[in-house]
């Protein structure tokens, strides 16, 4: 198991979910906490606003997703 403190990510070689967790998680997509949904909606709304006098269309950018 490796811990990256700057990313706050745990990396493990174990499969997920393990046998102890079977039956606890729904099949398919994992549930997303309401705080994340609210933050995503707020960021999308804020990012879609254009400055006054600007006709430029901007695509919303989600800054809290990290790809590695």
Curated annotation (Swiss-Prot):
Protein name: Neuronal regeneration-related protein
Region entry Disordered, spans: 22-54
Record organism: Homo sapiens
Any one of the GO BP annotations: regulation of neuron differentiation
Induction summary: Down-regulated in emphysematous lung compared to normal lung.
PTM sites of type Phosphoserine: 59
Consequence of substituting residue 59 to D: Accelerates protein degradation and reduces glioma cell migration
UniProt biased composition (Polar residues): 44-54
Quaternary structure and partners: Interacts with the latency-associated peptides (LAP) of TGFB1 and TGFB2; the interaction results in a decrease in TGFB autoinduction. Interacts with FLNA.
Post-translational modification: Phosphorylated on Ser-59. Phosphorylation decreases stability and activity.
Role noted for this protein: May have roles in neural function. Ectopic expression augments motility of gliomas. Also promotes axonal regeneration. May also have functions in cellular differentiation. Induces differentiation of fibroblast into myofibroblast and myofibroblast ameboid migration. Increases retinoic-acid regulation of lipid-droplet biogenesis. Down-regulates the expression of TGFB1 and TGFB2 but not of TGFB3. May play a role in the regulation of alveolar generation.
Domain of life: Eukaryota
Main location: cytoplasm
Gene Ontology CC terms, in alphabetical order: cytoplasm
Sorted UniProt keywords: Cytoplasm, Phosphoprotein
Subcellular location, record wording: Cytoplasm
Tissue distribution: Expressed in lung (at protein level).
Keyword Phosphoprotein among UniProt keywords: yes
């Amino acid at each position: 198991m490796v811990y990256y403190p700057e990313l706050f990510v745990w990396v493990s070689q174990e499969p997920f979910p393990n046998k102890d967790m079977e039956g606890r998680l729904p099949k398919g997509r994992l549930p997303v906490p309401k705080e994340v949904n609210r933050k995503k909606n707020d960021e999308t709304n804020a990012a879609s606003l254009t400055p006054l006098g600007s006709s430029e269309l901007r695509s919303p950018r989600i800054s809290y997703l990290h790809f590695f």
